Amino acid sequence: MFAFRCFVLALVLAGSAAALPSTADAALPRPAHVVIVVEENRSLAQVLDDPHAEYIHELIRDGALFTNAHGVTHPSLPNYLALFSGLTNDNQDGCPATGISNTAPNLATLLRAAHLSFAAYAEALPEEGWTGCAAGRYGRKHAPWVHFSNVPRTLSKPFSAFPKYTDLPTVSFVIPDIVDDMHDASIEVGDVWLKRNLKPLVAWGRANDTLLILTWDEGLDPDNTIATVFVGPMVKPGRYAERINHYTVLRTIEDMYGLPHAGHSADVAPIANAWR
């Protein structure tokens, strides 16, 4: 009888365990909005040590800083592609990108297939849907969605068309121009831009379930370290030492919304320990 009871208890416990979601699934929030902002060409130490990065340091204090975050390669374009599609290309910063299928699954196509929304806002983009390589302070190498024919051109918008916060898509990219993203200017210049454009959004987002992801494309040190910061009401502030990269961030967003995994995001785990 004792053995039978143990057997029944084991079956009950096994059934209960099978009904539970995985640790990662249970831990991930599903924000109303995610806004991803990508800066340029700074290592983690440069960002942390620069006294002029005052607003960035404020975001770090209020959010989750990943102290072991890395770009996946060099130079810019393959890192942007990795964050957007889980894939890289073979022609550096070439325009158009080669060595990558322009119909590969990506964050925009996955969201849209799940009846969720996506849009991208690039500062200095001449007009909605423009596909040229460069114009003034705009560079297509910093706009990965333009390299995919399965992303409607209407989703590629100038930053001047950034919507009212209540009209934000599920996931959006914000790309400053090549001065404001620190590519051709100092951290201080980028920090001023971020404060002017993000501070009101972050304040609104605290009450409206919005996650800000601030990251850099690549670092300038031998380990390709970058700063990556998550800020929002669902974030548990602190410093996190797990190793992450652009694939990890993509995987985290995919898992938040129950999406399939694009490219190499299938090879990594989501960020599961930085949430309230």
What are these regions (language model features)?
Residues 6-18:
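Bacterial N-terminal signal peptides
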Residues 25-276:
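Flexible, surface-exposed loop/gating regions in the mature catalytic domains
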Residues 1-5:
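Positively charged n-region of N-terminal signal peptides that target proteins for export
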Residues 16-28:
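C-terminal region of N-terminal signal peptides and the immediate post-cleavage residues
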